[in-house]
Each structure stands twice: as C-alpha cells, then as structure tokens.
C-alpha cells in the first residue's frame, strides 16, 4: 500500500480489498484500508484453520516427511515453500517484502505458520533436516528468500 493507492492492484484484489482499488465514491484512506485488511485477515485466518492443504500437496509432503524423517514444523515449512513457489500471487506478495535477514525470515514464517520462532529457526538452520536434505534452505546472500530444492 502506498500513500494514495496500492502498489499492486492484483494483490489488493486477491486479499479482498477490491472495493478500495480506484474508489470513485470515497477518498483512499490508509487507516481505513488497513482496518479493512485486518478485518479480512481475521476472517481468512478462521477459514484457513478449517481448510486442509490440497490433497496432492498434503500427500506429497507426507511422503517426503516419511522418507526424510521430517517433523510437523518441517512439513509446514515445506508445504509453505511449495505454495510460495507455485502460486504467482503469493510469490509476488513475498517479493514485496524485499530483502529480509535470516532472523526476519524465521520470525515471519513463525507468525504465518503459527509455530514458535525457535522451532522455525531450528528447522531452517544448517543442521535442520530441510537444509541437510536439500528440500528448503534460506538464501543467506541477502535476499532472505526461501529456496525450494536448491540443489537442482
């Protein structure tokens, strides 16, 4: 969100703020848009808590978890990384965060996945199974991006 509009209208539309894209009947007010966004977030969080992952993704994550020995936090991070790399809008939204430090990546993932920061840090650390197996690593070159299957 910028001062008088959205940086990306397609992302605003995707998160349910389409009535604020070029509003003709009112002035774009950041505080009102932010309040609408938080209201939408509360609703979406409740909906998502009830919604499982797509069956194929869940199946594949479970198979990899069994093969590699991933725990529940590893599985959630892996599933999120897959979604991040396969959903263009989610990837674009993540790109808007620009460069994140490793610590900021851990904190953001912990918040998004509703798991303790320390568990995310351990899962994505160099000794974590995700990194050792080559499934997911954090790009430490400055971008802070999650890299899925970095060994390809």
Give the predicted meaning of each segment.
Residues 1-152:
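Intrinsically disordered, low-complexity N-terminal extensions of AAA+/P-loop NTPases
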